[in-house]
């Protein structure tokens, strides 16, 4: 049939005749580089051509840092109880249920205890997939308990931050976690135990205003967004153009807010090096 006689525009194909292309075969970085998904995974989710660090969750960080991915998870079934009965576009309780089913996570942080390069340590790692890695009562409590475990067992503590900040659905309960976690880190310091803080993309809001910037050594992955308010909010509030690269890890390193930028492939070696140096141990 000639195109000018067609009743419908475009090309139509019966559903049963369409080709199903599996998702995840290829990944396109923000700079336009294309990489095979399997190769990306083998490269620890770092694009080899432009060194772009793809966001990963706690499961992958634990696999990278713990020897043979062997660890014990603390408080893994702790969940929020919606004390304010908060409702926005949907009930907070329903939102929690939906995101738990989608992510298979209980909240936005997990705590693991295991060996890294042969020595035991405690790692708390945030998951951005769970309501933007927002910090609520469960996040604060799990971090506090992780620090308590480190103090009790005289272990180094590592915090991996990846968060949009405080969880608005928990209001003051969320803001209380800034003080709680900061006090616990002060207790860790009194016990003379190392605290390594790793900021990943993005680390913003209340996390930056509390535990993310309180490490004995503060490090970051390349290119991570780190700040309090986001760049757009700062620009709209001040009415001024921001410096190039504002709130990137590289900008913060240049201005003294970070100690080191560490590529993902070097994280395990570097974190353990910093711990050994702080504790005056033999370098592993």
From Swiss-Prot:
Its main location: cytoplasm. It comes from the Bacteria. Residues 24-284 form the CoA carboxyltransferase N-terminal domain. Pathway: Lipid metabolism; malonyl-CoA biosynthesis; malonyl-CoA from acetyl-CoA: step 1/1. It is found in: Cytoplasm. Keywords: ATP-binding, Cytoplasm, Fatty acid biosynthesis, Fatty acid metabolism, Lipid biosynthesis, Lipid metabolism, Nucleotide-binding, Transferase. It catalyses: N(6)-carboxybiotinyl-L-lysyl-[protein] + acetyl-CoA = N(6)-biotinyl-L-lysyl-[protein] + malonyl-CoA. InterPro entries: AcCoA_carboxyl_beta, Acetyl_CoA_COase_Trfase_b_su, ClpP/crotonase-like_dom_sf, COA_CT_N. One of its GO terms (biological process) is fatty acid biosynthetic process. Its EC number is 2.1.3.15. It holds the Pfam family Carboxyl_trans. SUPFAM superfamilies: ClpP/crotonase (SSF52096). GO terms for cellular component: acetyl-CoA carboxylase complex. GO terms for molecular function: acetyl-CoA carboxylase activity; ATP binding; carboxyl- or carbamoyltransferase activity. Belongs to the AccD/PCCB family. Component of the acetyl coenzyme A carboxylase (ACC) complex. Biotin carboxylase (BC) catalyzes the carboxylation of biotin on its carrier protein (BCCP) and then the CO(2) group is transferred by the transcarboxylase to acetyl-CoA to form malonyl-CoA. Acetyl-CoA carboxylase is a heterohexamer composed of biotin carboxyl carrier protein (AccB), biotin carboxylase (AccC) and two subunits each of ACCase subunit alpha (AccA) and ACCase subunit beta (AccD). This is Acetyl-coenzyme A carboxylase carboxyl transferase subunit beta. The lineage of its organism: Bacteria, Pseudomonadati, Bacteroidota, Flavobacteriia, Flavobacteriales.
């Amino acid at each position: 049939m000639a195109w000018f006689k067609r009743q419908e525009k475009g090309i139509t194909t019966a559903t049963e005749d369409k080709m199903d292309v599996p998702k995840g075969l290829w990944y396109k970085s923000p700079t336009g580089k294309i990489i095979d998904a399997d190769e990306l995974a083998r490269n620890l989710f770092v694009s080899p051509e432009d060194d772009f660090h793809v966001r990963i969750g706690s499961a992958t960080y634990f696999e990278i840092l713990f020897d043979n991915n062997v660890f014990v998870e603390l408080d893994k079934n702790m969940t929020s109880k919606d004390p304010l009965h908060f409702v926005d576009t949907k009930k907070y309780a329903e939102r929690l249920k939906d995101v738990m089913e989608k992510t298979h996570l209980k909240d936005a942080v997990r705590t693991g205890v295991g060996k890294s390069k042969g020595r035991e340590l405690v790692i708390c790692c945030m998951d951005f997939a769970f309501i933007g890695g927002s910090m609520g009562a469960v996040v604060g409590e799990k971090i506090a308990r992780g620090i308590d475990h480190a103090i009790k067992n005289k272990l180094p503590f590592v915090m991996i931050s990846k968060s949009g900040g405080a969880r608005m659905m928990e209001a003051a309960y969320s803001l209380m976690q800034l003080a709680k976690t900061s006090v616990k880190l002060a207790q860790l310091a009194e016990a003379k135990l190392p605290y390594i803080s790793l900021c990943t993309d993005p680390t913003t809001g209340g996390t930056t205003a509390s535990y993310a910037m309180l490490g004995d050594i503060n490090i970051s992955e390349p290119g991570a967004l780190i700040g309090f308010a986001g760049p757009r909010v700062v620009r709209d509030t001040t009415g001024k153009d921001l410096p190039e690269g504002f709130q990137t890890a590289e900008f913060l390193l240049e201005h003294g807010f970070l100690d080191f930028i560490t590529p993902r492939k070097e994280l395990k070696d570097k974190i353990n090096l910093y711990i050994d140096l702080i504790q005056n141990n033999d370098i592993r």
